[in-house]
Amino acid sequence: MSRESVILVHGLWMNGVELSVLGQHLRRDHGFAVRTFSYPTLHGNAAEICGELAKFGASVADAGRVHFVGHSLGGVLVHRTLSECGREFNGNAVVLGTPLNGSKAASGAARWPMLRPLLGPHVRNELAVAK
């Protein structure tokens, strides 16, 4: 069995269940130990969540090499976490459907007071920075 792990990080409005098929595939067909990092997408702040993701990754890294797979907002959080403390991890990162340069849709929606609560602070602060 591989001493390599994959941490799956879900996107906005998700909880990690949507990545379970990918996790099963990585476990069954490639021998990875798969863990899911779940976080609140509509409250809290990205800096705290990235800190928690770094701690989670460090706890998994004790067992060997760690890779990250982030979907959408999860990819933004993976990117930020690895940018700030990536030297601690010796694996790879894959982001799926991740708006690393911001999102014009999120930026537009953030301008509407009725839609702001649906976006949460992570989207308003991380994704709505459309470039």
Regions found by a protein language model. Give the residues of each.
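Proline/glycine-enriched tight loop/beta-turn segments at coil->beta junctions
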Residues: 1-5
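Serine-dependent carboxylesterase/thioesterase catalytic core
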Residues: 6-12, 16-17, 26-27, 32-131
